[in-house]
C-alpha cells in the first residue's frame, strides 16, 4: 500500500473544524490609553471611598446595593440566630456539598431591574420553586477573616437545567459567618459591599450581631481586593467598575452560617495533621461541614434558601478517592493476568472463533479509563501516584497486549477469508492482447499481408503499480491502519463528549454516562453473534470470561452508587443492579451456547445454507455394534466413555450425557474435554488425521 496517498478521513477533519469553531473563547476587553486611564481612576476612587467610609457613613455606590426587602433582612437575622452547637468550628471549611434549595417569596419577587437581563436558565430554575444544588466551598486561611469562594450549581426540580454562580468574600471566624458576592459591575457594588452586609436590620430593634465590631476587619479585606484590581487595571487596562459584560445577568449576595463540629480545636488539628503528615496515629473521623445559607439578587429580585446542607471536607473526599484508586490498581493487575492467560491460546483454529469487536471494545474501554484517571489526577494533588499508576496499568493491556491480540485476530481471520475478486479487464490490457495476436500473425508465413494493413496501431502501456494485486501482507497492513484510525477516532470523540458533559444538567449527564457504560459493557454481544454466524461455541476461556466480567464491574458500580459528590447525581441502585444483570445475561448466553449449541435460540430454517456439524448425536449402547471393538474408549485418555442408556433420549439426564462425549465426522468417539483440548492446537482427528469442523 502506498502510504503517501493517504489523506485524513473526512470525519476527522470535520470534527477538528467543529471543535475549533465552537470552542468557547474568553471575551478580551479592548485596551487603549483612554480606557486604561479611566479604569485606574475608577479603582482609585473606589479605594478612597471604602477607606474613608465608616460603618454608619456608607458610600452611595454601596448603599444602592444594600436596598433589601424586609423578608431578606428577617431571613438573614434568622440565619445568624441559629444555634451553632457544641465544640469548635472547622479550621478550614473547604468542602464539597449537595442539598436542596427553596425560593423565598416576597411581594417584589421577580421584578428585574431595567438594565439587567434575566438569564433564561436561571429564570426557569427559580420558577420551579425548588430543586437540588451542588456547591464547592473554598476557604483561604488568613488571620481572623479568611477569604472564601463559593461555587454554586443550581438545578431545577427535574434536573434538566443548571446555572452556575460564583461568589467571593470573607469568613468571619468568631461568629461562624460567611459573606460573599458575585463580581463587581458598574451598577453593583459586589465584594466592596461586604463590610456592610452585617449592618443592622432597619426593621428590627435588637440585631443578632454587632456589625461595628467586625467592620475594620472586613474593610481591610475589601481594600486589599481593590488594590489587586488596581494592579490589574494598570497592567491590563480594564476594570469591572468601568466596563461590564455584553449581557449583564443577575448579581447576587450570599450569606452562610456554619455549625460547630462537636470537637475541640486540638482534636481537629490532630485529624488534619494525620492526613497531611501520616504517622499511623488513630484519630476520630473528621465531622462533615454543615452550612445553612441565603442567596439574594437585588438586580433580579430573587432569593432562595437552603438549610443544614452537609458535605465532607476536601481532604476526606480526596482520601476516599485515593483508597478507591489504590484498590483499582489490583483490579487492573488481575485483568492483565487473565488477559495474558487468554493470549497463551493463540492457535489459528482458536483465534478464528474470537470476536474482533469484543477485544476492540475492551481495549477502547481501557484507553478511556486511562484518560479519565489522568484527567482526575490534574484536580486531586494527593492522588498523583495511585491515579497515574491506574492510568499506566490501564494503558498496558490497551496498547501492549490487547492491540497485539487484535492484530493477531485480524491477520488470522483475513487469511481465512476468500481472496478478493479479480480486477475487471481494462482497455489497456485488451489492447495488449490484440497487439500480441497481431505480432504472432506477422511471424506466421501463412498470414495474409492485408492483415498488417487493416490492423490499427495501438500503444502498449507498461503495467502500472496500482494494477498489481495486493498481497495478503499488504491487505493486513491496510486493514490494520484503518482499524487503528477508527479506534483512536472513536476514543477522541468519546473523550470530547465526556468533557462537554461535565457542563450539562445532571439528568443529561447521567443519561450520557449510563448509555456510555451500558454500551461499553456489552462487549460479549459481538462474541455471541460471532458464535451464531460461525456455528461455534468454544471462544474465550471461561477464566477470561468470568474474570473480565467480574473485575470490570468494579468501576461502573462505583460510579452508579458512590459518585454523588463528583458527578452530581444521587446513588442509582436500580441502574447498578441492571448493569449486573445485563452482564450476567451475556455470560449465561455464552454458557448456554457452550452447552446446547451456538444457535440454540434460533430456528434451523435460518441456517439451511450453513449447517453446523453436531458433535453430540444420540449414541446408545446398542449402537456400538456399528463401530469397531472398544469404540466406547477414548483414544486420547484411554478411559471408557459414558453413553446414553437405552430408553428416552429427551430427558435432561440423557441430554447432559450427550454433552460429555463428541463424535467426529470420521466416526471416532472421544471425551468432550479431551477432544476440545486437542482442538485448541490442531483441527485434525487424532486417529485418522481427517479435518475436523470448528466446535
From Swiss-Prot:
GO biological process annotation, one example: ubiquitin-dependent protein catabolic process via the multivesicular body sorting pathway
Reactions it catalyzes: S-ubiquitinyl-[E2 ubiquitin-conjugating enzyme]-L-cysteine + [acceptor protein]-L-lysine = [E2 ubiquitin-conjugating enzyme]-L-cysteine + N(6)-ubiquitinyl-[acceptor protein]-L-lysine
Keywords: Endoplasmic reticulum, Golgi apparatus, Membrane, Metal-binding, Signal, Transferase, Transmembrane, Transmembrane helix, Ubl conjugation pathway, Zinc, Zinc-finger
Zn finger (RING-type) start-end: 634-689
Bias (Low complexity) ranges: 427-454
Disruption outcome: Lack of proteolytic cleavage of sterol regulatory element-binding protein sre1. Simultaneous knockout of rbd2, results in defective proteolytic cleavage of sre1 but restores its precursor levels.
Protein name: DSC E3 ubiquitin ligase complex subunit 1
Species this protein is from: Schizosaccharomyces pombe (strain 972 / ATCC 24843) (Fission yeast)
Phylogenetic classification of the source organism: Eukaryota, Fungi, Dikarya, Ascomycota, Taphrinomycotina
Amino acid at each position: 500500500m502506498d502510504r503517501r496517498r493517504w489523506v485524513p478521513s473526512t470525519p476527522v477533519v470535520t470534527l477538528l473544524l467543529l471543535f475549533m469553531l465552537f470552542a468557547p473563547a474568553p471575551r478580551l476587553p479592548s485596551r487603549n490609553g483612554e480606557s486604561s486611564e479611566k479604569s485606574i481612576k475608577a479603582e482609585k476612587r473606589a479605594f478612597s471611598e471604602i477607606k474613608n467610609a465608616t460603618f454608619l457613613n456608607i458610600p452611595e455606590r454601596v448603599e444602592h446595593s444594600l436596598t433589601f426587602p424586609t423578608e431578606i433582612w428577617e431571613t438573614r437575622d434568622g440565619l445568624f440566630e441559629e444555634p451553632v452547637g457544641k465544640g469548635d468550628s472547622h479550621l478550614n471549611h473547604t468542602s464539597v456539598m449537595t442539598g436542596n434549595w427553596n425560593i423565598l417569596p416576597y411581594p417584589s419577587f421577580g421584578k428585574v431591574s431595567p438594565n439587567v437581563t434575566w438569564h433564561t436558565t436561571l429564570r426557569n430554575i427559580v420558577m420551579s420553586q425548588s430543586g437540588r444544588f451542588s456547591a464547592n466551598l473554598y476557604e483561604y486561611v488568613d488571620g481572623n477573616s479568611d477569604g472564601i469562594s463559593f461555587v454554586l450549581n443550581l438545578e431545577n426540580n427535574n434536573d434538566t437545567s443548571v446555572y452556575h454562580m460564583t461568589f467571593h468574600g470573607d469568613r468571619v471566624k468568631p461568629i461562624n459567618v460567611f459573606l460573599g458576592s458575585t463580581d463587581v459591575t458598574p451598577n453593583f457594588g459586589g465584594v466592596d459591599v461586604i463590610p456592610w452586609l452585617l449592618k443592622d436590620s432597619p426593621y428590627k430593634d435588637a440585631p443578632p450581631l454587632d456589625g461595628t465590631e467586625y467592620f475594620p476587619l472586613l474593610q481591610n479585606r475589601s481594600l486589599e481586593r481593590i488594590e489587586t484590581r488596581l494592579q490589574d487595571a494598570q497592567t491590563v487596562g480594564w476594570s469591572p467598575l468601568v466596563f461590564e459584560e455584553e449581557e449583564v445577568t443577575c448579581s447576587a449576595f450570599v450569606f452562610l452560617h456554619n455549625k460547630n463540629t462537636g470537637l475541640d480545636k486540638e482534636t481537629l488539628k490532630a485529624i488534619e495533621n494525620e492526613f497531611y503528615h501520616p504517622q499511623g496515629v488513630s484519630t476520630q473521623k473528621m465531622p462533615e461541614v454543615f452550612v445553612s445559607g441565603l442567596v439574594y439578587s437585588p438586580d433580579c429580585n430573587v432569593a432562595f434558601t437552603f438549610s443544614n446542607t452537609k458535605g465532607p471536607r476536601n481532604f476526606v473526599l480526596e482520601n476516599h478517592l485515593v483508597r478507591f484508586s489504590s484498590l483499582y490498581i489490583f483490579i487492573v493487575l488481575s485483568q492483565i493476568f487473565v488477559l495474558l492467560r487468554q493470549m497463551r491460546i493463540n492457535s489459528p483454529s482458536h483465534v478464528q472463533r474470537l470476536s474482533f469487536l469484543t477485544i476492540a471494545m475492551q481495549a477502547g474501554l481501557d484507553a478511556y479509563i486511562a484518560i479519565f484517571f489522568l484527567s482526575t489526577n490534574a484536580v486531586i494533588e494527593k492522588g498523583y501516584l495511585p491515579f497515574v499508576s491506574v492510568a499506566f496499568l490501564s494503558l498496558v493491556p490497551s496498547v501492549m497486549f490487547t492491540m497485539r491480540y487484535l492484530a493477531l485476530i485480524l491477520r488470522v481471520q483475513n487469511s481465512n477469508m476468500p481472496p478478493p475478486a479479480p480486477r475487471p479487464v481494462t482497455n489497456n490490457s485488451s489492447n495488449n492482447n490484440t497487439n500480441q495476436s497481431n505480432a504472432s500473425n506477422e511471424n506466421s508465413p501463412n498470414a495474409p499481408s492485408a492483415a498488417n494493413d487493416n490492423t490499427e496501431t495501438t500503444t502498449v502501456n507498461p503495467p502500472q503499480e496500482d494494477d498489481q494485486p495486493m498481497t495478503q501482507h499488504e491487505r493486513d497492513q491496510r486493514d490494520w491502519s484503518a482499524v487503528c484510525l477508527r479506534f483512536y477516532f472513536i476514543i477522541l470523540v468519546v473523550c470530547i463528549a465526556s468533557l462537554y458533559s461535565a457542563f450539562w444538567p445532571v439528568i443529561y449527564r447521567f443519561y450520557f454516562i449510563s448509555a456510555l457504560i451500558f454500551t461499553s459493557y456489552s462487549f460479549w454481544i459481538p462474541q455471541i453473534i460471532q458464535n451464531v454466524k460461525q456455528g461455534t461455541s468454544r471462544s474465550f476461556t471461561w477464566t477470561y470470561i468470568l474474570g473480565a466480567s467480574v473485575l470490570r464491574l468494579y468501576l461502573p458500580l462505583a460510579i452508579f452508587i458512590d459518585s454523588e459528590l463528583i458527578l452530581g447525581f444521587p446513588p442509582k441502585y436500580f441502574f447498578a443492579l441492571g448493569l449486573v444483570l445485563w452482564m450476567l445475561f451475556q455470560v449465561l448466553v455464552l454458557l448456554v451456547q457452550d452447552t446446547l449449541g451456538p444457535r440454540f435460540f434460533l430456528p434451523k430454517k435460518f441456517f439451511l445454507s450453513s449447517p453446523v456439524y453436531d458433535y453430540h448425536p444420540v449414541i446408545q449402547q446398542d449402537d456400538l455394534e456399528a463401530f469397531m471393538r472398544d469404540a466406547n474408549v477414548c483414544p486420547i485418555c484411554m478411559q471408557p466413555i459414558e453413553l446414553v442408556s437405552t430408553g428416552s433420549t429427551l430427558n435432561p439426564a440423557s441430554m447432559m450425557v450427550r454433552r460429555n462425549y463428541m463424535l467426529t465426522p470420521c466416526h471416532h468417539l472421544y471425551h468432550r474435554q479431551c477432544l476440545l483440548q486437542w482442538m485448541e492446537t490442531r483441527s485434525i482427528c487424532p486417529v485418522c488425521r481427517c479435518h475436523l469442523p470448528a466446535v
